[in-house]
Regions:
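P-loop NTPase nucleotide-binding core
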Residues: 36-37, 41-46, 50-151, 333
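Short regulatory helix/loop adjacent to the ATP-binding pocket of P-loop NTPases
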Residues: 56, 191-209
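A short, basic N-terminal segment
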Residues: 1-38, 43, 349
Length: 370
């Protein structure tokens, strides 16, 4: 049988292929098992989704684990449909998984059964906007009636702030606190929005969860993990080359995994930094059309600021006179406006050391554009 590539870039392939996060996992599991909800905050590509699935694997079998990603949702009715579809049927026995049983709970929408390859039914819900809150209330009532321990992880939870409907936070908070045997994980990638939701006294979820910011994995731990898997495949591994990779991409999980995945695939070991350049070249070329369209869809001020931040790698003072002069940027007011636009579009974000291009491969493309 062909050996699996140990450096997964999509999904969760089990504890054998999961790097470190031992302290975070222990803290996470302890919170759930002691009836505390968790807020997990990390930029995208740091591995928070993988951590959620890893924690779910570590929990006692008495917990049913449910996961939904709401990043692409635009309004409350889409959330109601996604939430109900994820929850309903997850806590039941096969006998209970009948349309008639589910229909008893849901009067605000029409549930339908979708056939699955494994033979188990999956429910879909046709939710009209006017009945979205009612459908959500019915889903929580369904959870209450099941009387069964569960963990529900909602990824990119800050997206609810983008919904046009008002009062969504307060409505969800009132329901969440009413199901004591269900624990919730609220994960998000926008620090400022998640911080506002859970750390500001003005918001309904204020101090209602354990806050877990997620940092990058320790370099030595990651090197040990990578070395073990290269050696297991009979391939050599140079820690110095790995350190170059780690520093180039600031230890961010997705980039390390993507590049290690391709180096391991070649079967020649990881022996030099030149291999990193080869893989990055391929990644940039593969995405060049997308990056070009993205770049030229921005206005001139945003294009110039993107290029300037990419050129610096980590731009400390983007509104300073020296930064503007060095990169030949427009007035401070124009740069400030462009920065707000780029941040809202998730094209740049702020680290402890300064502003960076969110997608590091896009940053590589921008530096080559210059």
């Amino acid at each position: 049988m062909k050996q699996n590539n140990p450096f997964a870039v999509v999904g969760y392939n089990g504890p054998e292929y999961f790097c470190d996060r031992e302290k975070e996992t222990a803290k996470f599991v302890a919170a759930i098992e002691n009836d505390r909800n968790v807020t997990l905050i990390a930029p995208r590509r740091y591995g928070k989704t993988g951590l959620i699935h890893h924690v779910q694997r570590q929990l006692s079998p008495e917990y049913t684990c449910i996961y939904l990603d709401i990043f692409a949702l635009k309004n409350l009715s889409e959330f109601a449909r996604t939430f109900a579809s994820a929850v309903v049927g997850s806590l039941d026995t096969p006998v209970e998984k009948t349309l008639a049983t589910v229909a008893k709970f849901f009067k605000s929408c029409r549930p339908t059964v979708l056939p699955q390859e494994n033979g188990m039914p999956k429910f879909s819900f046709d939710v009209v906007p006017q009945q979205a809150e009612a459908t959500i209330a019915e889903t929580f009532e369904y959870l209450k009636r099941r009387d069964h321990r569960a963990v529900i992880a909602i990824d990119e939870f800050q997206q609810i702030l983008e919904f046009p409907e008002t009062g969504t936070e307060a409505m969800l908070r009132s329901h969440v606190q009413d199901v004591p045997w269900v624990r919730f994980v609220f994960a998000g990638s926008r620090h400022h929005m998640m911080g506002e939701m859970f750390l500001s006294a003005k918001h309904p979820f204020y101090q209602s969860t354990d806050i877990m910011p997620l940092d990058v994995i320790d370099r030595a731990k990651y090197a040990e993990f990578a070395c073990r898997h290269f050696n297991a495949a009979g391939q050599t591994f140079d820690e110095g080359a790995f350190t170059t990779l780690y520093r180039r991409f600031d230890g961010i999980t997705w980039y390390l995994q993507s590049i290690l995945n391709r180096i391991w695939q070649n079967g020649e070991g990881f022996t030099s930094a030149a291999q990193i350049d080869e893989v990055v070249d391929d990644l940039v070329k593969d995405r060049s059309i997308i990056f070009r369209d993205l770049y030229f869809s921005q206005n001139e001020s945003s294009q110039q600021l993107l290029s300037a931040i990419a050129a610096d790698g980590e731009a400390r003072e983007v509104l300073s006179g020296s930064f503007l002069l060095r990169h030949r940027l427009a007035a401070t007011s124009s740069v400030r406006s462009a920065l707000k636009v780029l941040q809202k579009k998730d094209l740049v974000y702020r680290t402890e050391n300064g502003w960076v291009v969110y997608d590091r491969i896009f940053g590589e493309w921008l530096r080559r554009l210059a």
